[in-house]
Amino acid sequence: MAKNSDGKEVSLKSVVENKKNTYVLLDFWASWCGPCMVEVPFLKADYEKYNKKGFEIYAVSFDSQRERWIETVKQQGMNWIQVSDLTGFQTPAAEAYAVQSIPANFLIRTSDGQIVATQLRGEALGEKLEELLGK
């Protein structure tokens, strides 16, 4: 189980089981990953639009430097759940989801824990959320 920037453990299971969440995006990223940072404006827009409709993001950082990870989250205004165990690709979550490269993401339906979509980049995430949650 990875920790947030305050050092508190936050499990994906607890986020998926939270009754206010209908869909959770499990997002793997790192501050040093250029393509990951390109996704941030899309994630921010979709989070703002759909969070109150039951959408949550559980972001797992592959950073190994705590300060760089936290500073990037603050600078980019990534105000959703952020966790890291600061071990890079060696995190158990990466192994569980067979993540070989980033960015990588999985959209999980919380009612049954099923992955309903993967690799939703750019406008694709917003389009999928609109389909699932409405405008």
Language-model regions: role of each:
Residues 30-34, 63-66, 88, 122:
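Solvent-exposed loop/turn segments at secondary-structure junctions
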Residues 25-26, 57, 105:
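Hydrophobic beta-strand anchors of alpha/beta hydrolase catalytic cores
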